A protein has these predicted regions:
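Accessory interaction regions appended to the cores of large information-processing enzymes
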Residues: 1-356
């Protein structure tokens, strides 16, 4: 920063007592007050003898909870309060998850998050509620189908008419929501309506018919249709494509995809049995294990993201606070039928089974 900081007094702390001292020598642990520009991680030194230390390595926060204001209208206060707290604590992080419409508070462990909420109430007078986060599930299909979509509305004057026949199949690319193609011959659907048909597909992919999650890995092809020279419109063809999509999707063996994380767990050898057993109970798949240069065991596994909720606390309990872990998103895979039952209504499950 190369900024000047004026320090009037220095102190040492002994329990709850703050004792003013004339100086602090090398090796002393002391305190200063009313710093205007200094933040956590900064180095304070004399201009005549500048000393710059490397910033300390900060542990990556993996524990997170969904948070929300208990009182409507406190959102701005909470945002500014958390910004100040993150300047003090570099392991604290806030993420705005727009996809799932939630705000996430990250920290090193559950206790840190609870202390943060307590500080928000005590210091900044804002009350925050923590809850289990939502996870980024996806929807896709397993087989190719053809489906019609016909939208017709007459209410005096010009009506609305759009008629399409489409095919839907897996694209093989779960990173992309959809691929759109058209194979219409003979002008059955005028070209100027193709973008409206694609728009209908695009909007359907943002909230899938199965459980309301985003759709991925689908190829939609416009095959045929019909139009009316007066009543047809872009809106009518978009609605027709929407009807075709919803019917075709539910006929094409739809499945729910859950996010999978690649996890590395570092523990002393004596805890490996308990840790691996716990990973299996969390529907994890252990990929391998090897020793690091400190003599500890590194367990690598794939595990559903939803099963990592609360893992930090459980790992510390199993290993006496010694175990460490890190993870990153790997891919999405088909969720087991038991999870599907928890996510879907009876009516939707019955509709899926009827098409198997």
């Amino acid at each position: 920063k190369d900024a000047e900081e004026k320090i009037a007094k220095v102190y040492v702390l002994r329990g709850k007592d703050v004792i003013e001292v004339p100086e602090l020598k090398a090796g002393d642990i002391g305190a200063v007050a009313k710093l205007s520009v200094t933040q956590t991680g900064d180095t304070i030194a004399l201009r005549s003898a500048p000393i710059v230390y490397h910033k300390p390595k900060i542990s990556t926060p993996y524990t997170y909870m969904r948070f929300a204001a208990k009182t409507k209208g406190d959102e701005d206060k909470i945002s500014s309060a958390l910004a100040r707290m993150m300047e003090e604590d570099l392991t604290l992080r806030v993420v705005n998850d727009t996809e799932n419409r939630q705000s996430l508070l990250y920290g090193i462990g559950d206790q840190q998050l609870e202390v943060t909420v307590s500080k928000l109430l005590g210091r900044y007078k804002v009350d925050v509620e923590l809850s289990k986060p939502k996870f980024a599930f996806r929807e896709t299909i397993r087989r190719k189908v053809e489906a019609p979509g016909r939208y017709k509305k007459q209410s005096g004057g010009h009506g609305q008419f759009g008629d399409v026949k489409m095919s839907f199949e897996p694209s093989g690319d779960l990173e992309t929501p959809y691929i759109f193609e058209e194979k219409v011959f003979g002008g059955a659907v005028p070209k100027n309506y193709f973008p409206a048909v694609e728009k209908g597909v695009q909007e359907c992919c943002t909230k899938g018919p199965l459980a309301g999650y985003p759709v991925v890995g689908i190829k939609a092809t416009l095959l045929d249709g019909s139009y009316h020279p007066v009543d047809s419109s872009e809106m009518a063809f978009k609605m027709a494509a929407t009807l075709a999509f919803k019917k075709g999707f539910m006929d094409a063996n739809p499945v729910l995809l859950e996010p999978i994380a690649s996890v590395k767990v570092v523990v002393p050898d004596k805890f490996t049995g308990d840790v691996m057993g716990d990973l299996n109970r969390r529907r994890g798949r252990v990929l391998g294990m090897n020793s690091d240069h400190h003599g500890k065991q590194v367990i690598e596994a794939d595990i559903p993201m939803s099963e990592l909720f609360g893992y930090n606390t459980d790992l510390r309990s199993m290993t006496g606070g010694i175990g460490l872990y890190e993870y990153e998103f790997s891919r999405s895979v088909e969720a087991p039928i038991t999870l599907l039952y928890r996510k879907l209504s009876f009516q939707i499950i019955a509709a899926i089974v009827s098409h198997l």
